[in-house]
Amino acid sequence: AFGNNVWQIVALVIGIIILMFGVGRGIEKANKIMMPVFFILFAVLGIYVAFQPGAIEGYKYIFRVDPKAFADPKTWIFALGQAFFSLSVAGNGTLIYGSYLSDNEDIPAAAGRVALFDTIAALLSALVIIPAMATTGAQLNQGGPGLMFIFLPALFKSMPGGYIVAIIFFVAVFMAGLSSLINLYEAPIATIQEKLHLGRKASCAIIAVIALVVSICIQGIVSGWMDILSIYICPLGAGLAGIMFFWICGKKYVETQVNTGRDKKLTDKFYPICKYIFCPICFLVLILGIVLGGIG
């Protein structure tokens, strides 16, 4: 259970070094490389896998429509859970990255672009991974790490120059994981800077030591508790944040925030729709997710 300490330490050290340069420079530099690499790689892989025997079954699985599934509450619970995970709605990313936005940034438009490109990335991934599974005769309803670490390497192996592609791909995966690690650590680092009035490097060093000691001590026993955190606590916290923003902060505050940086104000219907329709439905689905399972 404690065999991954070395790689855990390596990832932590790299993340802290990037954070010492500041989130604006460190994360931005990493993401400017990571995002184009991911999109280009998946586009190339999508074209390649389309010509492999059996890939058509993967496409049929992806685009098959089951009308009965739309009436199943779990379908919507799973969809919301995927949105929480993929968009990091329940994570520190929204808080941290949002705090670095310029006052001239059109937040609703930026949120729309994030959702659009996230959906494109998810579709590209599906158009590669599911057909790749179909070419090997695997069960297409499988999930978990095997999707990336078993079926994609098999696809790389069949490609001309596949070893080079595999190296580039998993470097990009590493960078994606690193960007997630960075936004998780940025919140406590920023808190120490603000509350204790310490410098950036000193704050990073304190969090690094605490994270290193705690993570090594609990590595072998943490998986069950992490499931509880990601499946229940984070989505619940996100739902409460939505209620606080739309129900407690008040209409004037909300409209001021969402219209900052926009050339044209949002419709007056935005606030009542979010307050009286979106938030209650979202919170209801969160509760159903906790009861029935599926979010996270």
For the regions a language model picked out, list residue spans one by one.
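Inter-helical loop and helix-membrane interface segments of multi-pass membrane transporters/permeases
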Residues: 1-20, 24, 56-77, 142-149, ...
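Loop-to-transmembrane helix boundary motifs in multi-pass membrane proteins
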Residues: 5-6, 117-123, 163-166, 175-178, ...
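Membrane-embedded translocation segments of transport machinery
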Residues: 28, 32-178, 202
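Hydrophobic alpha-helical segments and their helix-loop junctions in multi-pass secondary transporters
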Residues: 39-65, 214, 240-256, 287-295
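Hydrophobic alpha-helical segments of multi-pass membrane transport proteins
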Residues: 175-184, 204-214, 230-258
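Alpha-helical transmembrane segments
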Residues: 184-198, 221-224, 243-267
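A generic transmembrane alpha-helix motif of multi-pass inner-membrane proteins
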Residues: 223-246, 264-296
